[in-house]
UniProtKB/Swiss-Prot annotation:
Residues 1-11 have a biased composition (Polar residues). Gene3D superfamilies: 1.25.40.180. GO terms for biological process: mRNA splicing, via spliceosome. Residues 86-95, 501-531, 781-791 have a biased composition (Acidic residues). This is Pre-mRNA-splicing factor CWC22 homolog. It is found in: Nucleus; Nucleus speckle. Residues 18-32, 110-129, 162-187, 195-209, 846-871, 879-954, 961-979 have a biased composition (Basic and acidic residues). Required for pre-mRNA splicing as component of the spliceosome. Promotes exon-junction complex (EJC) assembly. Residues 1-225, 497-534, 752-985 are annotated as: Disordered. Component of the pre-catalytic spliceosome B and the catalytic spliceosome C complexes. Component of the minor spliceosome, which splices U12-type introns. GO terms for molecular function: RNA binding. Residues 257-440 form the MIF4G domain. Residues 548-664 form the MI domain.
Length: 985
């Protein structure tokens, strides 16, 4: 500011030289004197100023600061001298001087402005005070100087002073702003507490504060305190004996709040019935504020489930209308609050909930019309968007109950659209809304499927206008002590029983027998009525529905890009189960109609077979039907059908048991069926390869289903199958058939021998039974006679001779019977295979033979002691397991010895008869003992054959076993012939 005052003084000093005449010499001398006097005065003032300024914060070294009066005085005098010199030069160059003066003044102003800015940044409030004092002194000087000047100069000085004052006020305002910031900063700094010293000791009063916190009951706090586990909460409730106390009520309130919040958060379309039952188990009359708050919060958090929450409110409103009214009041107030605050999101959620409540008949449609009128009265982009979303939810309901009202709303929307005062996006939304109305709100039903749970007669509709004042009853959201807590709980329990029909079962049990009889009669009448209705069922024999069904399937197949899309379309048709087979037939017919086979149909059929078992069974039945009627198809259709079934078999979509209906023989096949089988197996070989196909056809679990395909019952059919598969290039599948055909004669012989052996075994079994009975009776008689003779040894010779003759006759007859019996038994034993003989019978026969031999040995011992030596000389019995060759060598030697030892008298003849009978018994026993050895030999042979033919095993591999049986029978037959020859010798 001081620099500006100096500039103004310079300008004023320069002023007379611009417009007045040039001064004379006398005037110049007077000015010099004045300048000297003023300089002396200024020097005195400067000394005083130096005394004041020394020691101030701005001058550390005692030198005069920039902008001080001392620094300003000398340049002022110099400028005055320069101006006087310029005035005394010449009067002709006024214009040039004027230009120079103006430029110098402008330069001085700029430099002065920069200097003032720098000084303002670095100066303090003390400097400003000193500057103001110096300015006042300079003003007084300038005033004393300006009194003698012209009015034009005064006017200029006044203008410059006004400019200076303006600049001064601006600087002061800047300083005041800066000082106010500094004061605020200092004030905040003073408000902060000083950081505690590290050495400070902790306060001694902290333990009592902690004790006070521990004494607080977390349950009695406003938020319920920390989380308490349910088990601990139940334990705490059980410990409280007074159920009406504050603590118990508070705990029950917390449990009620948690259960309501949990149930509301879990509800969806599928479990809404269960959630409502669990919700009614809680005292929602006491917690109606909690319930309303939970529903509104859940709906605001997830508006996509608004239809579910509206269904919950509708069910609760039908039982407790005051709860539905409370929720609707809070919704209306939320909408009004959001509308006043221009909160679009809150308006959207609230209006959507109100729209669904109108659809559920909880709120009246007048409320909807009022809200739409309010939104479209002064339309904006947001209000029109909210109105359109609201109309989408309840437009169909308004169309039914208030067509005039919704027509007025759409007229208003049309006017808004034509006025074009809204955004393009909102205009498109209005056009979409008209299109939705034209389609009949098909994507926005009144009540979604599965949520129409309340009858219209049971619902209570609330008539609540939009502009009324409502009480939201927020006090219900917080806990409050109930003096009649137990009574209210009992009242709610009775209400709950009535709602949930818990007492209906008890009342039904107390009813009399008459009621049961009446119920039975009613049920019988209903059943009879149902039967009559079933009798009246009309069947459409024109198959119009079948034709339409086939047409839809054909169009769906032809309009699909891939098989997955086609399967999805066909499944979504929801056709009845009776049409399952028709669908499979249609897929097969569409495949057969193609010029060439398309894999699309095979994949489609395979997908249906994997989806459901019914489709697989349908394709199995279709395979059999198609094979039986294959002669009706053309060659092209036949090829496509065979290839689609080959694909199903390769992918195991259809079991391989379907090949059971194929029988390869000259009589059971036609040219069409042979072509079908040829294409089928060639496709299978192309899909799987010959080794895998052969392995699948040799699977033991599937052999019963391949008997007709690879027949073994007749060599003619076997030869036909071999030739057929060889001709189509699949001869590798017939290796086992070829082996079977080679062994067929042997198997036929074994079969015939088995038939003969079975007949002979049946006859021999009957004869052996009769002979065994007669032999046992004769043996018993002989034993009795022997005992009698031994006991009566002292009797007379006459009685002894008679008894000897009787015994001889009996022995002769017994010998004949034994011969016939031994022949029959040897034949039966030779003809009967060791596997056919039962082990129990073998054991019984062995026991009987052993008992007979013991009896005979005892008879021989008692009758003739001389015979004992002959028996000792006879060869011993062959041990078990002795080879047949050794036995054959011993038997001729034994017969020769018998011929040498044969006596000539009658007694020796008797002994020879007995010896021959004993030898026959021994031979019989040896033949029976020989059978296990033969059996073990046959088993070892069969094991070796089974090892060799393990890989080529099939169901008809028993031909080798039959051949083994034949070999065994032939060996046995040869051995029996040898025995007979030896006996006859």
């Amino acid at each position: 500011m001081a620099a500006e005052s100096n500039d103004s003084q310079k300008a004023m000093n320069l002023g007379p030289t611009l417009r007045d005449e040039p001064p004379s010499t006398e005037e110049i001398e007077q000015r010099q004197r004045k300048a000297s006097t003023s300089s002396s005065e200024d020097g005195e003032h400067e000394d005083n100023d130096r005394r004041r300024v020394v020691g101030s914060p701005g001058s550390r070294d005692g030198s005069p600061r920039v902008g001080s009066p001392v620094a300003r005085a000398s340049p002022r005098a110099k400028r005055d001298q320069k101006s006087s010199d310029s005035d005394s030069d010449s009067s002709d160059s006024d214009d040039g001087v004027m230009r120079k003066i103006r430029s110098s003044v402008m330069h001085i102003r700029r430099t002065s402005d920069e200097e003032t800015k720098n000084r303002e940044r670095s100066s303090s409030p003390d400097r400003h005070e000193k500057k103001s004092k110096s300015r006042s002194r300079s003003r007084s000087r300038s005033r004393s100087r300006s009194r003698s000047r012209s009015p034009r100069e005064r006017y200029r000085r006044a203008r410059r002073s006004r400019e200076r004052e303006r600049d001064r006020y601006g600087d002061r305002e800047r300083y005041e702003r800066r000082s106010s910031r500094e004061r605020d900063w200092e004030h905040r700094r003073r408000g902060r507490s000083a950081s505690p010293d590290k050495n400070d000791k902790p306060p001694t009063e902290e333990p009592p504060v902690k004790k006070r916190k521990e004494t607080l009951d977390p349950i009695l706090t406003r938020t319920g305190g920390a989380y308490i586990p349910p088990a601990k909460l139940r334990m705490m409730q059980a410990q409280i004996t007074d159920k009406s106390s504050l603590e118990y009520q508070r705990m029950s309130w917390e449990a009620l709040k948690k259960s309501i919040n949990g149930l509301i958060n879990k509800v969806n379309v599928s479990n809404i019935a269960n959630i409502i039952q669990e919700l009614l188990q809680e005292n929602i009359v006491r917690g109606r504020g909690l319930l309303a708050r939970s529903i509104l919060q859940a709906q605001a958090a997830s508006p996509i489930f608004t239809h579910v929450y509206s269904a919950v409110v509708a069910i609760i409103n039908s039982k407790f209308p005051q709860i539905g009214e409370l929720i609707l009041k809070r919704l209306i107030l939320n909408f009004r609050k959001g509308y006043r605050r221009n909160d679009k999101q809150q308006c959207l959620t609230a209006s959507k909930f109100v729209g669904h409540l109108i659809n559920q008949n909880v709120a009246h449609e007048v409320l909807c019309l009022e809200m739409l009128t309010l939104l479209l009265e002064r339309p904006t982009d947001d209000s029109v968007e909210v109105a359109i979303s609201f109309l989408k939810e309840c437009g169909l309901k308004l169309t039914e109950v208030s067509p005039r009202g919704i027509n007025a709303i759409f007229e208003r929307l049309r006017n808004i659209l034509h006025e074009s005062e809204i955004d393009k996006r909102v205009q498109y939304m209005i056009e979409v809304m008209f299109a939705i109305r034209k389609d009949g709100f098909k994507d926005h039903p009144i009540i979604p499927e599965g949520l129409d749970l309340v009858e219209e007669e049971d619902q209570f509709t609330h008539m609540l206008p939009l502009e009324d004042e409502y009480n939201t009853e927020d006090i219900l959201n917080v806990f409050k002590l109930d003096p009649n807590f137990l009574e209210n709980e009992e009242k709610y329990k009775t209400i709950k029983r009535e709602i949930l029909d818990e007492g209906s079962s008890d009342s039904g049990d107390d009813a009399g027998g008459s009621g049961d009889d009446e119920d039975d009669d009613e049920e019988d009448e209903e059943a009879a009525a149902g039967e009559e209705q079933e009798k009246v069922t009309i069947f459409d024999q024109t198959e119009v529905n079948l034709v339409a069904f086939r047409r839809t399937i054909y169009l769906a197949i032809q309009s699909s890009l891939d098989f997955e899309e086609c399967a999805h379309k066909l499944i979504k048709m929801d056709f009845p189960e009776s049409q399952t087979k028709e669908l499979c037939n249609m897929i097969l017919d569409c495949c057969a109609q193609q010029r060439t086979y398309e894999k699309f149909f095979g994949l489609l059929a395979g997908r249906f077979c994997l989806l459901k078992k019914e489709y697989m069974e349908s394709f199995e039945a279709i395979f059999q039907e198609q094979y039986e009627t294959i002669h009706r198809l053309e060659t092209n259709k036949l090829r496509n059908v065979a290839r689609i079934f080959a694909h199903l078999l390769y992918t195991d979509s259809v079991p391989w048991s379907v090949l059971e209906c194929v029988r390869m023989s000259e009589d059971t096949t036609t040219s069409s069926s042979r072509i079908f089988v040829k294409i089928l197996f060639q496709e299978l070989c192309a899909y799987m390869g010959l080794p895998k196909l052969n392995e699948r056809l040799k699977d033991t679990t599937l052999q019963p289903f391949f008997e007709g395909l690879f027949p073994r019952d007749n060599p003619r059919n076997t030869r036909f199958a071999i030739n057929f598969f060889t001709s189509i290039g699949l001869g590798g599948l017939t290796d086992e058939l070829r082996e079977h055909l080679k062994n067929a004669p042997k198997m036929i012989m074994t079969q015939n021998q088995e038939v003969e052996s079975s007949d002979s075994s049946s006859s021999s079994s009957s004869s052996s039974d009769s002979s065994s009975s007669s032999g046992s009776s004769s043996e018993s008689d002989s034993s009795e006679s022997d005992s009698d003779s031994s006991s009566d040894s002292d009797s007379s010779s006459s009685s002894g001779s008679s008894s000897d003759s009787d015994s001889r006759r009996k022995k002769a007859s017994g010998k004949k019977k034994d011969k016939s019996k031994s022949k029959k038994s040897s034949k039966a034993a030779n003809q009967r295979s060791p596997l056919e003989e039962r082990p129990t019978k073998r054991h019984e026969n062995r026991r009987q033979d052993a008992s007979k031999e013991d009896r005979r040995g005892s008879d021989k011992h008692n009758r003739d002691p001389q015979r004992r030596g002959q028996q000792d000389e006879s060869p011993p019995a062959r041990p078990r397991g002795e080879p047949e060759r050794i036995r054959g060598q011993k038997e001729p030697h034994r017969h020769a010895q018998d011929h040498q030892d044969r006596p000539t008298d009658s007694g020796r003849h008797k002994d020879d008869g007995k010896n021959s009978r004993v030898n026959k018994d021994k031979d019989r026993r040896r033949s029976r003992e020989k059978e296990p050895l033969r059996r073990s030999r046959d088993r070892s042979k069969s094991r070796e054959r089974s090892r060799k033919e393990m890989d080529s095993r099939d169901s008809y591999g028993n031909g080798l076993e039959r051949a083994d049986k034949e070999n065994r029978h032939s060996d046995r037959y040869k051995e029996s012939r040898r025995k007979d020859d030896r006996r006859h010798r």
